[in-house]
Amino acid sequence: TLFKHNLVEIRPEKKEAIFINLDTQQELVQPYDMIHVTPPMGPPDFIKNSPLADSAGWVDVNKSTLQHNKYQNVFGLGDASSLPTSKTGAAIRKQAPVLVKNLLSLMKGEALTASYDGYTSCPLVTGYDSLILAEFDYDLNPQETFPFDQSKERYSMFLLKKYVLPPLYWHGMLRGRA
């Protein structure tokens, strides 16, 4: 992992990744065996340039209630929010019920009692048929779903990622069923 570096080129024939240091603008050539690239993430301009945004441009929400820190009738979650956790489908799956419960409570004039703990999940592919399913909260405490040690590589977790999670996402989560 290279922090404060931007990937600008990949030379697959040489197995080299070219990065620019964001502080010094110096080029770094990094050899690799396998490379996993995450595109740069940032808030959309219509949020970044609005009064809803925090200093970094994300929707400024309370990390537990998901309610905006200035406008009480605004809530935020997922990729546009300032939540200090990974922007993953697993995270938003746990954020959505908290947001709904707290929004309904606000509409009824009740206290916001639902709380998001920062849960997120990161399936780490470790081989052609193995995976570690890392699940954790804001404090990086394990939040394992299954009754076994998920810090170990498992074929079953690979099968879950390959065959179960895609339909769960497309036919469950996106339709509010999971």
Language-model regions: role of each:
Residues 3-16:
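A conserved short coil-to-beta-strand element within the FAD-binding core of flavoproteins
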